[in-house]
Amino acid sequence: MKTAEKLGIIGTTISIFGIGFGWGVFPWLIRMQIGRVSLSPGSETREFWEKIPFPIDFKIHIFNITNHVEVQNEGKIPNLQEIGPYYYKEWKEKSEMIDYENDDSITFFMKNTWFDNKEKTLPLTGDEMVIIPNPILVGLITAAEREKKGVLPMINKAIPILFNKPDSVFLKIKVYDLLFGGIIFNCTTKDFSASAVCAVLKKEAPFLETVSRSVFKFSILNQKNGTEEPLKLQIKRGIKDYTEVGKVIGANGKNKLTNWRGRPCNNLEGTDGTIFPSDISEHQDIWSFNLELCRSIPAKFVRKSEYKGIPAFRYNVTIGDTSTDPSLKCLCINDTFCWKKGAMELLKCSGLPVVATLPHFYDSHEDFLNGVKGLSPNEENHSIFFDIEPMTGTPLYAKKRIQFSFPLGKINKIDLTKNLPDTLLPFLWVEESIELPDYLIDKLNSELFRILQFLDVIKWVITLFGAGVVSGGVGLYYKEKNSLPITPTSSATSKKIDNPTDKTTTHELGHTNFGYIN
């Protein structure tokens, strides 16, 4: 009996150890170790953060307007033809990094560099001609209508001089020139109105690239290619407190933005978008700062997913609804005008009055889609999402997509707009996609998941071994119980038992244990 009891106690203890450590302590220790990631100078994480060691796929789609004459003269609904994608390899890195030991932070600028990926772009070459809203002309008119209505008559007089007597707000241009070559804008003039407009543009149009003293140009990528973004960010390194790694705490030396009409739109939330927290729960949003939108934006958990055998959480991102969400009212143009669901204007962000939405007006108000023809929004091709490994916070697979559109419509005192339809006209949309390379997948597997798999086996071995010891103790207990020796009775007693009339028989029978020893 003592051996059986000992086996039961030992087995139970082993099983409890296996369950407690295997399902509780081991995972906790791993999460604690993995979670202690920081941007310590010289560390592998810091090097990866400073420059992503592989190029990101970057794609651009251009919208060609096939009925621009009818749109300009008759106010017809624009008919769009999507041209693309044009592929590029995008390298992302940080520059001018300065570490601050006192508050465990680092300041830096983002820098993107694009290289043409001609093989993927084929059969397109960039020589394709497209008709688009003239970004300088439409941008100038719209910005003035938003901010300085009093200068609209002056702009109306300056348009024929600065834009060579245009008969339309639309422009025919080669795709390459739109993306890199540039749209030339010549301010060489002695006309007072034109000179005044040029003076304003020089001061308030950061999207224009200077060619000479009086000549400028506009392109989508050339001015930004290989140059620092104008916003200097400050984030936590996570050396003193690993839970704060990547947290944005400053922009251009301030602890909040100044682009928008107030809080919470000017608040800095989450990380810089290139590093994420570890030990993520599906019940929490993931916040990050988006440079293109000049705002922090949350990603919402959608479902559990998997990427190349690695368990992941899928999150998606939407623009939001400035017209109904009280927390987004500060993104509205003014007290009386807010864009409907899925749209936000970037005049206060980029200096150009374009409107950001998801491509093809996916997850946006139906009025936007009804205002044009030729779009087919769907989740697979037009949503923003990413898959992230929750224990380490490693992004595994992501697609970030943004469409840029120009507000179109009649603007008082601008002759060229008198017949234009009121619509939001898509201009182009871009996609950044990232897939963690196989060599990094193997690294993640070898340093994390193979350890987890090993521990998973160990915890079951320990638990089942303990259960086996308990089972052995139980078996031994019953074996001992069933194999106890039988004590033979005397012949006299037997005779007494055989004689039911003998009184002493009852007395002896009352003290027998039927052959068992207590």
Curated annotation (Swiss-Prot):
This is Sensory neuron membrane protein 1. It comes from Pediculus humanus subsp. corporis (Body louse). Glycans are attached at residues 64, 186, 225, 316, 334, 381. One of its GO terms (biological process) is sensory perception of smell. One of its GO terms (cellular component) is cytoplasm. It is a multi-pass membrane protein. Signal peptide: none annotated. The keyword Disulfide bond applies. Residues 30-456 are extracellular. The keyword Magnesium does not apply. It is found in: Cell membrane. Keywords: Cell membrane, Disulfide bond, Glycoprotein, Membrane, Olfaction, Receptor, Sensory transduction, Transmembrane, Transmembrane helix.
